[in-house]
Every structure is written in C-alpha cells, then in structure tokens.
Amino acid sequence: MVTIKDIAQAANVSTSTVSRVISGNPRISMQTREKVKATMKSFNYQPNRAARTLATKQSNTIGIIQKSASIEDSQNPFVLDVLSGIFSKCKNHGYATISTTKGQSIEIELEVQEMIHYHSVDGFIVLYSKKSDPIIDILKSHAMPYVIIGKPLTDDDIIHIDNDNVSASQSLTRYLIDKGHNKFLFVAETGNYEVVKDRIAGHLNAIEQTDSVTDIVYFAKNRHYIRSFFQDLIEHRTLPTVVITSDTLLNHLILSVFYELKLHIPTDIQTATFNDSYLNAFASPPQTTVDIYPKLLGEGAAESAINIIQGHNILNFYKLIPTTIIERESTTTIQEV
C-alpha cells in the first residue's frame, strides 16, 4: 500500500509537505503542489480519510443527531427523506456522515459527547427542535458548528432550515373548512416538539376565524389507547367530521384503528396529515397531506452545515422550504358524502 512517506520520497519533499498539499495549504508553492499531485497521480494514490484528518485537523464528517433511533423513528418516511437530502449534498462536497444510534435521550447525549471528544465530526445537523434540549447545550458548550431542522427556541443567530408550519397548518384547516367541515379533531404527537406546537397554532388560528370547533389530543403511538379513545367517541356519537394528525405514522396508526372499528373514509369520517410520502399515496384511501419537501430540508441543512464548517459567510440564518397541499380521496366536500 502506498503511503504519504512513499509519495514524499518519490517527490523529494518532506512528509509534512505532502500533508500540506493534501490539506490545500495555500503556503505551498504552485510548483511544489503540482509536483506532489503529479506524483500522487502516478502512484494512483488517494488520501484516505485518516490521512486527511491528520493533515487538515478536520474529519470531513458531519454528525447527524436524531431524536431517537428506534425502529419507529428511523423508518419514518420524513426521516428517510431528510437523510437522503443530507447524504446527497454531503457526498457532492466530499463529506461523510455519522448518525446517533441510540433510542434514549441520555444515551444520545453520550454519543454526541464522544463524537466531539474524539474529533469524529466537524459539525452537526440536528433533525428536530425541542424545548430545553440538553444536546443543544452540549453543542454550545463545545462551540461546535450545528444546524437545526426546525425552529430554534432561543438564539436568533442559530442556522436553521424549516417550513412555515403555522401557515401550512392554517392553510390545511382552511381547505377543510371550505370542504364544509366544522367539527375537527387534531391528534398530535407527544414529546414537546416545536413543529407540533406550530401546527397546532396554525390550526387554531384558522378555527378561531370561523364558528367551527376543535379538540386537541396528544397521543403516544399506542394502539390500544387510540382505539379506546375512538371507541368512546363512537359510543357517545361525538365523532368529528375530520381528523388531522401532526405526523404521517400517527395518521396510519389511526387509519388501522378506523379499519378495526369499521369507520369508512371519507363517508363516516375524513382524514388529513403532514408530510407526503408513498405511504400516503398508497393508503386506502389515499391520504390528503401537506407536502413539506423533507429532501429539500435535508439538502439545505447539509449545505448550511458545510458552509459553516468551511468558514463561509452566512448571509441568511433561516432558510424557508415551501409547503403544498396534496388533495386525495381521504377528504371531500361534506355535501358529497
């Protein structure tokens, strides 16, 4: 295997000079740089990541912090699409990625601390925004570059990529009101996440401008509890005309409960959710959704993280990704039911 030492001997320079050429050090003369690069090419030498790390004091790796690495969360279409955007943008810029793999918050904190301690990453992308998050405190205390997908809660100068979830939820609710709905149920994921709060806020904004009514309920993804809740609504004849869920997986859990309870969509009840994916398109019936373009969120987060790591000036601390309502068979005009 060809090493940096072999390249240095063949080019008649020191190993430190080869390292500086690999790192792109501008103090190396053009003549020396070209000589070393020609020697590397003649040996078909490609610096491995360890060599680059030693030369540049950087790992060329970005850490990805997920809220959980449970099967449920890691297979969420939103997460998969965001990661696809991150991976493609990082690959185009020569960066690798490493993700947290634990399910509990305290375990994720330890993972992040180890990545920082061993200089495994140059910066982080956080895939969520949560109130009183100790992981953000860790990143700040170590002055680590990071980007949030979501809305930051404190510092205005945190680089973040997000949708306008208040506006998106407000638009979805108005769309349903225009369909004749006036009795809503908004089912939200537990966990104190800012995206959920914003979607509830937008929903309430739209409701308050009409004579419609709504209830907000929070569910962990617990099938038994959700089934009992809707069974009770059926028995007391208090079903809403439409259920909005804050999350696609929560929506599909509710769809399966409706199937068990023999509630037919859209004749008995209607449904809508956030984050379009193949799950929504292939559902029975296909689900009306708000497309939040998660791959664009991932690409934007990766690009911003790379720019920060490379020391580029950041002109905009906030990048907004648009949203679109995708109308499908799970919603229809009430008079047509």
Swiss-Prot record:
Keywords attached to this entry: DNA-binding, Repressor, Transcription, Transcription regulation
Gene3D superfamilies the record matches: 3.40.50.2300, lambda repressor-like DNA-binding domains
CDD domains linked to this entry: HTH_LacI (cd01392), PBP1_MalR-like (cd06294)
Residue ranges: DNA binding: 4-23
Domain of life: Bacteria
InterPro entries xrefs: HTH_LacI, LacI/GalR-like_sensor, Lambda_DNA-bd_dom_sf, Peripla_BP_I
GO molecular function: DNA-binding transcription factor activity; transcription cis-regulatory region binding
Domain HTH lacI-type residue range list: 1-56
Pfam families linked to this entry: LacI (PF00356), Peripla_BP_3 (PF13377)
Residues annotated as signal peptide: none
Stated role: Transcriptional repressor of the malA gene for maltase.
Matching PANTHER family: HTH-TYPE TRANSCRIPTIONAL REGULATOR GALS (PTHR30146:SF109), LACI-RELATED TRANSCRIPTIONAL REPRESSOR (PTHR30146)
Protein name: HTH-type transcriptional regulator MalR
Organism: Staphylococcus xylosus
Upper lineage: Bacteria, Bacillati, Bacillota, Bacilli, Bacillales
